[in-house]
C-alpha cells in the first residue's frame, strides 16, 4: 500500500467543507459544533495518517471492511476504491450528509466498482446483531464519537467479531491505544499520535 495513493484518493473524493452533523446519540456529551472537514485522515496538513495506514494495510487483503463514522462518505469511497472485492460497511446514526454528498462523490469517480452497505448504529448502544450476522471483520475503523466510553463500548462489541490477522483502528483519540491494548492483550498495538491500531 502506497501512502501517496492514499493521500491522492482522499483528495479526489473529499475537498474540505464546513459541515455540521445532524443526529447525535443521546449519550454523546461531545461538542456538537460544525466540523471543517473534507477528508481528514491522510494528508500531512490534516491528521497525516497516510504512512501509518500504508504500513497497516501493507499485507492486508480484507474481505470485510467496517467503518464507524461515515459523515460525508469520503472514507467509504476510499475503502471501496482500495478494496473493490471487499464488502464495505458504513455505520453511523445519520446518513443524511452521506446521501447529500453521494452525487458529488460519484462525480469524482467514487463507487464505480463497489458500493458500501449502510447501517444505522449507535456507538453507545449494545446492538451487535447486524454485525454478528456478517462475515468476520478484517479491517475496522472507529472514526465515531472520539470519546473513551464510546470507543471502549465499540471495542467490547466488535472485538469478538474480528478475524485473526485483522486490524482494528481508532482515529482521532490519543488514548485509543490503551483501550485497544486492554481489549486485545496479545495484539501488536501501534500508537501514532491520534491514531492507534491493533493488529490481531
Which residues does each PLM region occupy?
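A short alpha-helical cap/connector motif
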Residues: 1-200
Amino acid at each position: 500500500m502506497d501512502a501517496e495513493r492514499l493521500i491522492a484518493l482522499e483528495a479526489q473524493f473529499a475537498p474540505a467543507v464546513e459541515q455540521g452533523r445532524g443526529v447525535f446519540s443521546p449519550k454523546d456529551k461531545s461538542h456538537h459544533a460544525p466540523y471543517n472537514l473534507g477528508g481528514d485522515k491522510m494528508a500531512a496538513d490534516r491528521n497525516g495518517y497516510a504512512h501509518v495506514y500504508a504500513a497497516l494495510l501493507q499485507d492486508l487483503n480484507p474481505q470485510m471492511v467496517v467503518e464507524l463514522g461515515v459523515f460525508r462518505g469520503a472514507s467509504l469511497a476510499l475503502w471501496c476504491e482500495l478494496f473493490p472485492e471487499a464488502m464495505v460497511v458504513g455505520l453511523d446514526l445519520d446518513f443524511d450528509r452521506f446521501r447529500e454528498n453521494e452525487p458529488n462523490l460519484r462525480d469524482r469517480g467514487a463507487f464505480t466498482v463497489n458500493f458500501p452497505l449502510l447501517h444505522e448504529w449507535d456507538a453507545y448502544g449494545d446492538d451487535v446483531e447486524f454485525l454478528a450476522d456478517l462475515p468476520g471483520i478484517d479491517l475496522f475503523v472507529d472514526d465515531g464519537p472520539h470519546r473513551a466510553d464510546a470507543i471502549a463500548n465499540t471495542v467490547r462489541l466488535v472485538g469478538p467479531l474480528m478475524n485473526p490477522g485483522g486490524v482494528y483502528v481508532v482515529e482521532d483519540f490519543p488514548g485509543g491505544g490503551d483501550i485497544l491494548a486492554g481489549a486485545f492483550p496479545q495484539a501488536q498495538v501501534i500508537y501514532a499520535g491520534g491514531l492507534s491500531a491493533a493488529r490481531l
